[in-house]
Design a protein with these regions (language model features):
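N-terminal and secondary-structure boundary signal
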Residues: 1-185
Length: 185
């Protein structure tokens, strides 16, 4: 059962829209309609605050078709959607604050490939240009990236991770998975 947190009760909004990734105005309108349906308080985002946006950047390609660079469409948040949500957040900050785009993809994913395929550096630069008083940051939250060949991890590369630091949490017997067989023991 979900209970209210320090951030309030959970809210979800679903709208039926047109698949409009190429039409920025239509996509922006659909995103704004979905956000409006949540009925956030007017002061939900204040100038000077830090907004964190966590898209789903699971993997740079569908593992069933690794050589098809378009296979990412079904497994990540579309970059046009990420761009419009980041721009919405920047507008709420009214010229001052921070927007961070970050995720922790699968350990065997290449964040460099995700950045390249989705032109995330261009997205960040565009936002910096259009919202000069807002700081935009992009980073991979993982501590390491694995190289996997034929299902076998052959190397691991340490990553800088979250510049604000990391905390290890050990739930042990408090975990919902405690007592079940598998890697979560």
């Amino acid at each position: 059962m979900l209970t209210p947190s320090a951030f309030g009760s959970p809210h979800v909004s679903v709208i039926r829209g047109q698949p409009a990734y190429e039409d920025e105005a239509l996509l922006r309108g659909q995103i704004e309609a979905a956000i409006a349906a949540i009925d956030l308080p007017a002061d939900f985002i204040q100038p000077g605050e830090h907004v964190v946006i966590k898209p789903n950047w699971v993997k740079e390609h569908d593992t069933r078709t690794p050589h098809d660079e378009a296979s990412w469409l079904a497994i990540i948040t579309h970059p046009a959607f990420v761009r419009e949500v980041a721009r919405w957040a920047a507008r709420q900050l009214r010229g001052t604050g921070r927007v961070t785009l970050c995720d922790a993809p699968q350990s065997d994913s290449s964040f460099d490939a995700i950045r390249r395929l989705h032109r995330l550096d261009d997205l960040i630069e565009e936002c910096r240009r259009d919202f000069p008083g807002v700081t935009f940051t992009l980073f991979d939250m993982r501590c390491e990236e694995w190289k996997v060949v034929d299902g076998v991890t052959v190397s691991k590369r340490e990553l800088p991770s979250d510049p604000a630091g990391a905390v290890d949490v050990h739930l042990d017997e408090k975990s919902e998975f405690f007592g079940f067989p598998g890697l979560g023991k």
